[in-house]
A protein has these predicted regions:
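Short strand-turn motif at the edge of the Rossmann-like AdoMet-binding core
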Residues: 5, 83-85
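Adenosine-cofactor binding site in Rossmann-like domains, unifying the SAM/SAH pocket
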Residues: 9-40
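Local beta-strand N-terminus motif with an aromatic residue
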Residues: 44-45
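A conserved beta-strand element that flanks and buttresses the S-adenosyl-L-methionine
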Residues: 48
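Short catalytic micro-motifs in class I SAM-dependent methyltransferases
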Residues: 51-55
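Short N-terminal helix/helix-N-cap motif within the alpha/beta-hydrolase-1
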Residues: 57-61
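A short glycine-rich, Lys/Arg-flanked "PGG" loop and its adjoining helix->strand segment in the class I
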Residues: 63-79
Length: 85
């Protein structure tokens, strides 16, 4: 499964588009600072976080939780794309 985390208005065809807000036609509404994420362990083959990570983790526990969840949902050969400014 390919997942576009924190997609906002950038809806991608063929991907599961997740955002915190139900403003755009996303597939899943979920706060990325709330654990666990709504995906099975090892179920994601590609994860995209485009200008999202810098908005997460007001403290170290939350940031570490985000990283742990990304690791948990990634398949063994997953690709993780993180773009930050």
């Amino acid at each position: 499964m390919k997942v576009n985390l924190g997609c906002g208005s950038k809806i991608l065809q063929g991907w599961v588009n997740l955002d915190k807000y139900d403003v755009y036609p996303v597939d899943v509404v979920h706060d990325l600072e709330t654990f666990p994420y709504p995906f099975e362990t090892g179920s994601c083959t590609e994860i995209l976080m485009n200008h999202v990570l810098e908005h997460l983790g007001a403290d170290a526990d939350i940031f570490n939780g985000v990283v742990k969840e990304l690791h948990r949902i990634c398949a063994n050969d997953a690709r993780l794309y993180i773009n930050v400014p």
